[in-house]
Amino acid sequence: LKRAGLDYWESGCVKVHESYDAFYTYWQEIEASKRGRLVAFSKFGGKSHCARGAYKPGDWLLFGSEVSGVPENAHKHCEATGGIRRIPIDEEHVRSLNLSVSVGVGVYEALRQIDEKGMEVDVEYRPQYGKED
């Protein structure tokens, strides 16, 4: 984590929790109007990571380990607040994505949809690979 933060540490805030339950207790203690939703990423998710309107400002994105994913109680909490997103993979040949890849895909899709910089974004655009312009 320290290496990944490079020289951006002054711009961010990192808090380490002993367990998911400790995190959830911390999250519940935040004033409800400022808390945001819990959104998990899992191969068991029912909604695509790039589904329209999948993210809102203030969302907390949860990623689990490559082996075990997010804890079962996190699935329950996320379903109740923000849902569970799925990043598609070919499960016949791939068990899971590397955690850093999943985080990159999820975070940048959330930023694209929320568009906090005020740039216009065409959420209907989907590249047509293999077709000539």
Predicted regions and their residues:
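Post-transcriptional modification and biogenesis factors for structured RNAs
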Residues: 2-133
